Design a protein with these regions (language model features):
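Core alpha/beta catalytic barrel or barrel-like domain that forms the active/cofactor pocket
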Residues: 1, 39, 85-88, 135
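Active-site histidine-anchored catalytic micro-motif
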Residues: 1-81
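Aromatic-enriched hydrophobic runs in primary sequence
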Residues: 24, 30, 81-86, 134-136, ...
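Active-site catalytic microenvironments in core metabolic enzymes, especially phosphate/sugar-handling
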Residues: 30, 41-43, 61-67, 87-98, ...
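Short acidic (Asp/Glu) and glycine-rich catalytic loops that position anionic groups and cofactors
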Residues: 50-55, 89-93, 137-142
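Hard-cation-handling environments
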Residues: 98-161
């Protein structure tokens, strides 16, 4: 999902789309999983209407296939009973897009730290930078850590990052 999309008449259009997807199934056990690029503008509405958000961990974006595989693995775990719990923190920082490379630099360090900090209790760590050219209040660096069951574990790692 391109998570920085918005229109003049609909800010954060992807939040509207995710909410619509959540409303479709009559069974709340149907997972709603989204993969997104690193330039996502994350809102509480997106987090609340998905079971898990999985961001790319490379910029340039070359890991879409691996993130789709990760989403499929998470879905399989959910069908087996896993109840993911997500902690979401948005920081008041908007990095210029050219500084959001993942091979080296401060943003790469955040991505690497999150990936290295994953344990069996943590199913995903996503650090997204937002899209600097979006004129939105929900723009900026966001950390979403999803635990397999324990929100406190997810929150602790999100705050640490």
């Amino acid at each position: 999902m391109l998570a920085a999309i918005h229109f003049l008449f609909c800010k954060l259009a992807q939040a509207v789309g995710v909410a619509a997807a959540r409303a479709l199934p009559q069974d709340p056990a149907v997972p709603v999983i989204a993969t997104l690029d690193l330039h996502a503008n994350i809102s509480t509405r997106i987090v609340d209407n998905t079971d898990i958000l999985i961001s790319y961990i490379t910029n340039p974006h070359v890991d879409q296939y691996e993130r789709a595989q990760e989403a499929a693995r998470v879905m399989a775990e959910m069908f087996e009973g896993m109840k993911p719990q997500a902690a979401f923190i948005r920081l008041p920082i908007v990095a210029p897009t050219v500084t959001m490379l993942t091979a080296q630099g401060p943003y790469a360090d955040l991505i690497d730290y999150g990936q290295q900090a994953k344990t069996d209790a943590i199913v995903n760590v996503s650090v997204v930078g937002g899209f600097a050219f979006s004129d939105l209040a929900k723009n900026g660096l966001a950390v979403i850590v999803t635990a397999r069951s324990d929100l406190a574990t997810a929150r602790g790692l999100a705050e640490d990052i």
